[in-house]
Design a protein with these regions (language model features):
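Trp/Phe/Arg-rich N-terminal binding region typifying the photolyase-homology
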Residues: 1-30, 240, 259-289, 293
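Glycine/tryptophan-enriched, flexible segments
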Residues: 2-199
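Secondary-structure transition/capping motifs at alpha-helix termini
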Residues: 143-148, 164-167, 245-249, 263-268, ...
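Short, mixed-charge aromatic SLiMs
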Residues: 162, 180, 203-210, 276-289
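Aromatic-anchored, charged helix-turn/loop surface patch used as a conserved interaction hotspot
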Residues: 176-238
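C-terminal structural cap/anchor segments
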Residues: 224-259, 264-267
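Polar low-complexity intrinsically disordered regions
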Residues: 295-299
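Conserved small/polar residues in nucleotide/adenosyl-binding loops
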Residues: 301-308
């Protein structure tokens, strides 16, 4: 992360010059109509008893009507909709505004607080494209009254986690997460086709995990873990939160992963189990950042000790 942060500090202003347009489709002819024959074909193939438009309205209505509308689809019907979270860009901006007003100022000291945390909770909306990291960043910079002149030119390229932007401590900490760690995950996924495999971790990390495979004091099956049926009640609570709310508190996510690493038969099994659970239940799963977070548990982006190296 340090070397990637150094790169960002040297090149970020250039990236600002080519940032996305607010409306990338402006001036582009948009024809969203679908041919009637194609609609009839879709209706026949899916065996729906309604037109596509009627079907969308039924799904949006939710409840038993929505579930019945979704029933013909080949999806995992055991994973229920998360009723406490509403999708869409409007909801994303409401949550962003709330975060900026009530949490950003204490993000640097409160993001790991499980009782009254300062985490943004925006990852599902970012994952589904309901809000852009650019919009979040620009909202913070505007709120802070930031200009390029606030950058600490003397520390540019040193990779400092705080102070380079010239923002408040909370904003500095959040922007580092939003840019450095998020983009690090996407950069890794772009360059490594095996980014979702334990084969992507360094050799020293793989050797270290293998050396400690026999250290496990307790073991559970995948089914027991998915059902949150362990003797660790804190871990069970995190797993239930994942299944019911589609998220795990940031601070508990690392505990969640490390315990699976401890309980699984092997590091490879642990990685597979974490990916399977996260991809199935997490609203921000199936994402480069999910995989880098999981493999951080497996020592990715950490440095070897003299004994390990």
């Amino acid at each position: 992360a340090h070397s990637f942060r150094r790169f960002i500090q040297k090149n970020l202003l250039k990236a600002f010059e080519s940032s996305p347009k607010e409306n990338p489709l402006e001036g582009v002819e948009k024809n969203l109509e679908v041919d009637d024959d194609r609609l009839a074909e879709i209706q026949k193939d899916t065996n729906f008893d309604s037109t596509p438009l009627e079907w969308m309205w039924r799904v949006a209505q939710g409840g038993s009507i929505g579930r019945n509308a979704l029933a013909p689809l080949d999806i995992d019907h055991e994973v229920r909709a998360v009723r406490t979270k509403v999708g869409g860009s409007r909801e994303a901006r409401i949550r962003l505004d709330s975060f900026l007003r009530t949490k950003l100022g204490r993000y640097d000291v409160g993001r790991n607080d499980t009782d009254d945390g300062a985490a943004s909770g925006l990852s599902p909306w970012i994952h589904f494209g309901h809000i852009s990291p650019y919009e979040i960043l620009y909202s913070i910079l505007e709120r802070e009254g930031w200009t390029p002149g606030d950058l600490d030119e003397e520390s540019t390229g040193r990779g400092s986690r705080a102070g380079w932007w010239g923002l408040s401590p909370g904003a500095e900490a959040f922007v580092d997460q939003l840019i450095t760690w998020r983009e690090l995950g996407y950069n890794f996924a772009f360059h490594r086709e095996d980014h979702y495999s334990i084969d992507s971790i360094p050799e020293w990390a793989s050797n270290t995990l293998s050396d400690h495979t026999d250290d496990r004091r307790q073991s559970y099956t995948f089914e027991e873990i998915e059902a949150a049926e362990t003797e660790d009640e804190v871990w069970n609570a995190a797993q239930r939160q994942l299944k019911e709310e589609g998220l795990i508190h940031n601070y508990l996510r690392m505990l969640w992963g490390k315990r699976i690493l401890e309980w699984a038969p092997s590091p490879s099994d642990a990685a597979d189990w974490m990916i399977k659970l996260n991809d199935r239940w997490a609203l921000d799963g199936r994402d480069p950042n999910s995989y880098t977070g999981i493999f951080w548990v497996c020592l990715l982006y950490t440095s070897p000790s003299p004994r390990d190296g």
